[in-house]
Each structure stands twice: as structure tokens, then as C-alpha cells.
Amino acid sequence: MVKPEPKIELGKDLINILDEKGINPTAFLWFYLPDGNTWRLVMSSPSLDKDIKKAYEDFIKEFGKEVSVKAIGLSNISIVPGDNNLLRLLKTAIKTGRGSIGGVRFTSNIVNGVLIEDAYIYRLV
């Protein structure tokens, strides 16, 4: 089975939109899920941390019609709290600047004994 590529440009479009709307994610990345051979767009922001379920519902209402969100697919987007285990693990290995929209491919790395098969990181503060 061929591993798909993350939708890098669509993710970049979406993080720009979120920044413009004042969401300012502190974590925004594609994470590869090998069991399903799919990518998940993972994001976190202090403004979304209080109630993740409500944050996701609000996200759908405000951004669900955005072209980038439709192309990515809502089922491929996860909003997680800032203290999420995956984010904490990744932050031990890599961080980007606050407000930056980088492009760091993080492939086949072991962090604290955990294999990170693939990730594409725009922002991780």
C-alpha cells in the first residue's frame, strides 16, 4: 500500500485563516496514522482548551464552509488540549516560533522511546 502525502498547502491555508480570525494555534500539524494509512490534522490553541467538544462544534460552525476545511474533511481534523500526550512528546524534540508557519517534516524518529512514523509540523510552541 502506498503511503499518501499530507495536504500541506491546504493545512497552510487553514492555519493562515485561523491566525487571521485570532485563534492563533499553538500546535498545528499533520500526523500520520499508519494503521489507517491516513493523515490527521491536529491543532491546539489556548482559546480552544476549555471544552474540546464545544470548540470542535464552534470550529465547524465558523470554518466548516472554508474551502480548505472541506478539502481536508472534518473527519480528518482533531482539536486537542495543549497538554495532549502527542503534543508533549513532540515538543520534547522540536519547537517552532510562536506565530510562525514553518514546514518541518519529522519522519521516522524515535522520541522518548516512541516511534513517530511521520508528521508535518507548521507550528509547535
Regions found by a protein language model. Name each.
Residues 1-10:
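N-terminal presequence-like segments and adjacent domain-start helices
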Residues 10-17:
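Short, non-transmembrane alpha-helical segments in secretory-pathway proteins
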Residues 22-39:
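Short edge beta-strands and adjacent turn/loop segments
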Residues 31-34, 46-47, 125:
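Short, flexible beta-strand-to-coil junctions
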Residues 42-54:
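A short interface-forming secondary-structure element
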Residues 51-72:
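Short, non-transmembrane amphipathic alpha-helical segments
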Residues 61, 71-125:
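Catalytic "initiation/cleavage/transfer" segments centered on a nucleophilic residue
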